[in-house]
């Protein structure tokens, strides 16, 4: 039996919003596997969804740049919004992006090594930790990018589309957060995991398994549509799907990348009272 630590319970509470005892029970039943605990809590109805894990938990900027038939996107993190707007921090991020584009670098460790000296100097000057977090590139016939402030950046690659359409698609991706291009692109493990969750929920309604399975088939079609770009309602004209929009223009999306500042990073919250108490004991 895995040890159920306080930190593990705290993480599950933050990710689900459930009570401490419910989290501890779920972790015990899942033998300490937090992902399995979340699945079980969804199935039991203890939570409706486990989406808090994607909450923004760090600051910084997203930068994008298109160079011919290749586009790059970069995330550089700092600790506060104040520093994220600092001219020196912005210039550092721009310099890192330019280096990635010039050298066609998509390995973040290469960029970290190349800019470590400058990063350390900037940390000393600004007084906050700075991290070159991730970089990616996208190739395509027609490329478009969109930035929502400095916190969300999107790249889209398409065929048969003009620049205006690709820009609109990038804006859609920024707003609607699709995970795949088409419903058929949704990976088998994601489909299977969601299918089992939905089947358990349907079975709990007391319906026969055959009817429950038919109910789940409809839900799965809706699910794969919701998480895919072409299956989503187009944000600028919700009466049609993105797939219908592309068909009207005889165009196709070949790929996209969406970065949001701090997604997936847990922000450390300082307990001021505990910190003061600890300092008192040391003195």
Swiss-Prot record:
One of its GO terms (molecular function) is translation elongation factor activity. Keywords: Cytoplasm, Elongation factor, Protein biosynthesis. It is found in: Cytoplasm. Residues 80-83 are annotated as: Involved in Mg(2+) ion dislocation from EF-Tu. InterPro entries: EF-Ts_dimer_sf (IPR036402), Transl_elong_EFTs/EF1B (IPR001816), Transl_elong_EFTs/EF1B_dimer (IPR014039), Transl_elong_Ts_CS (IPR018101), UBA-like_sf (IPR009060). GO terms for cellular component: cytoplasm. Pfam families: EF_TS (PF00889). HAMAP family: EF_Ts. Belongs to the EF-Ts family. Associates with the EF-Tu.GDP complex and induces the exchange of GDP to GTP. It remains bound to the aminoacyl-tRNA.EF-Tu.GTP complex up to the GTP hydrolysis stage on the ribosome. This is Elongation factor Ts. The gene is tsf.
């Amino acid at each position: 039996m895995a040890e159920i630590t306080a930190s593990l319970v705290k993480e599950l509470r933050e990710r689900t919003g459930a009570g401490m005892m419910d989290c501890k029970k779920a972790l015990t039943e899942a033998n300490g596997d937090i992902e399995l605990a979340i699945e079980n809590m969804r199935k039991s109805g203890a939570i409706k969804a486990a989406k808090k894990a994607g909450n923004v938990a760090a600051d910084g900027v997203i930068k994008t740049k298109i160079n011919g038939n290749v586009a790059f996107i970069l995330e550089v993190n700092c600790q506060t919004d104040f520093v994220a707007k600092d001219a020196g921090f912005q210039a550092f991020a721009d310099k890192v992006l330019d280096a990635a584009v010039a050298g066609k670098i998509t390995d973040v460790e290469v960029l970290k090594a190349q800019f470590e000296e400058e990063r350390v100097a900037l940390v000393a000057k600004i007084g906050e930790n700075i991290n070159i977090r991730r970089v990616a590139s996208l190739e395509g016939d027609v490329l478009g990018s969109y930035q929502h402030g400095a916190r969300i950046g999107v790249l889209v690659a398409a065929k048969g589309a003009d620049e205006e359409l690709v820009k609109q698609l990038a804006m859609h991706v920024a707003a609607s957060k699709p995970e795949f291009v088409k419903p058929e692109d949704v990976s088998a493990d994601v489909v299977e995991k969601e299918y089992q969750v939905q089947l358990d929920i349907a079975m709990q309604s007391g319906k026969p398994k055959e009817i429950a399975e038919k109910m789940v088939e409809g839900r799965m079609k809706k699910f794969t549509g919701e998480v895919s770009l072409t299956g989503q309602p187009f944000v600028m004209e919700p009466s049609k799907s993105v797939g219908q929009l592309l068909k009207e223009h005889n165009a196709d999306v070949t790929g996209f990348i969406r970065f949001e500042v701090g997604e997936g990073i847990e922000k450390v919250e300082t307990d001021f009272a505990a910190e003061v108490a600890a300092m008192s004991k040391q003195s």
